[in-house]
């Protein structure tokens, strides 16, 4: 998995998002990251959102944690969170990073995540569009 500092443009998916796709939680064992506590309520909500996450792109396989010897099946989804004219994108491994490595994501991410009830609703898709997420919906077309 590629490393991106939090809230920097993420070009992992290989399309032009004009700087509106910002990375959160794309960690690497060679880079420092913020640590702290996440509430159980926020962790459960993020877990639920990732469980049912809208996936506009096909995964090329699972990514493993390079911070530890984690060997579980994980890392093949991403969560897209619309916020203030941008889309914040976090890998599924963010749950592992929070739980096992005490990763603390930016406040902007948790605030935006709390506003999302589900990624399976039309309201969510409208929020993506309202925050420059057209590239996500175009990527989902066959």
Predicted regions and their residues:
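Alpha-helical interaction/linker modules in multidomain eukaryotic proteins
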Residues: 1-142
